[in-house]
């Protein structure tokens, strides 16, 4: 419970216990993501595409409307609260729990109801997740290594029902021929914009037809520009052993995770040293030192590559003929000032 150990027979509280080896998923580098779908009554919500983003975890729904809704995490004992429960933006990407090496975890206990979390006080109102790390085993030193390599393919238009350039131009032509009313005529490299230029005599019929032909042939692959087939590799090495009186466990872990979106990467290193000393059946102590460092690169939370690739018309170019970024502009607003040009490629490269 974070304070004491109680057998399942002696507890009437709502508690779920899982072993780390039973939920280990190759290619997933954090234990909070591995818990998804494994604990009854627990929801794990991934709110970001960043490779090391912290999922939102809810146990038996929300216990408050405006306050913090996240459970308290406890790593071994004694009970200590963690700042990862903060909703501040600085805790959005990466946290102390995500820094744990999953290979170092023995069991995970989830305390759900009031009787189970009462010992933690008001901080346990949203549930408590207790993580017990591995200990040394009696015997000669045992060295273990675990490593894996995972390859994920990028999303593509084959997986989604989106119009290609020719279909988009045909759809726009049908809307105009049906006299549909546009709240705002699309600007930039669109059929509607070219048609408006033709009607206002800014371009000739031949120039209009040339623009339409160019639009139909463009077929910009936004998924290819913004995403990649990502590679993840993780490594874990540990040594354990000892006697009945003194047991030790030492480990080191490394992971390199490429995000599906270009420019989003996470590199993590962790280390753990743990010594258990037992004088007799009544007296003993545990000394533990752990260390973790994470280096993340990514994009701003207001930039969503998937939404952009999914929603942007394929008639829109990514680059101008001179190789510079193509900037899209909206029509002038009521102030008469034009909006600043935008392209997600520039946003990703300068975030």
Where are these regions (language model features)?
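Short, small/polar-rich motifs associated with maturation and membrane association
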Residues: 1-273, 277-288, 292, 334-335, ...
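Acidic/polar loop-and-plug regions of large Gram-negative outer-membrane beta-barrel proteins
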Residues: 292, 297-351
